[in-house]
Regions:
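Conserved beta-strand in the GNAT
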Residues: 10-12, 72, 147-149
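ER-lumen resident redox/N-glycosylation machinery signature
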Residues: 14-18, 75-78, 120, 124, ...
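Short, structured interface segments
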Residues: 61-81
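Short, low-complexity N-terminal intrinsically disordered segments enriched in polar/charged residues
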Residues: 83-85
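Core segments of cupin and vicinal oxygen chelate
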Residues: 1-9, 43, 51-65, 93-145
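Vicinal oxygen chelate
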Residues: 2-7, 14-42, 59-64, 88-98, ...
Length: 167
């Protein structure tokens, strides 16, 4: 793990097979009990794409939420002790209008989170479309902050590709 003042990057050099689609997920969250987290995700509406498997430092699983949002859940054999960040990043999730409500409902249930705001007319400049508006939902939970950007998917580069940011 590489830690910067504003985030971490995980790098692994696996010498064993890696279950597909591990590695294609947009984000990951550290959990304290893998079995409970997977069960909670499943009962909250997630599909378990990759059941828990051992990695060099713990266990991982991949779940998918409404809208196709793939998320890694991971657990460490020895709990990590990271220095506090100078700035806390937000997880950015892009979803369609068709999936937004289901995604937010299910993820909030899983994370015991709270919808902090739901702005139906957020400024389009935030997604590279300055003359328009879009729906932006902000969620907070024990996993941190998440911004859900509800779009039609027709975004100019690099919007829609970033997975983290800062308010």
């Amino acid at each position: 793990v590489i830690q910067t003042p504003v985030g971490t990057i995980s790098l692994f050099g696996y010498t064993t097979p890696i279950p597909y689609p591990f590695g294609s997920e947009r984000t990951g969250y550290l959990v304290t009990d893998m079995n409970a987290a997977v069960a909670s995700a499943r009962t909250s509406g997630a599909e378990v794409l990759v059941s828990p498997f051992a990695d060099p430092i713990g266990r991982d699983a991949i779940v998918a939420w409404p809208g196709g949002i793939e998320m890694q859940l991971y657990w460490h054999t020895t709990a990590p002790h990271y220095a506090p960040f100078e700035a806390i990043p937000e997880n950015r999730v892009y979803v369609s209008a068709d999936a937004a409500d289901a995604f937010v409902r299910d993820f909030v249930r899983f994370s015991h989170g709270t919808v902090e705001s739901d702005d139906a007319r957020a400024p389009g400049i935030e997604i590279g479309r300055p003359d328009e508006t879009y729906r932006r939902i902000r969620v907070t939970s024990g996993f941190g902050r998440m911004t859900v950007l509800v779009t039609d998917g027709q975004l100019p580069y690099p919007y829609g590709r970033e997975t983290t940011g800062y308010e």
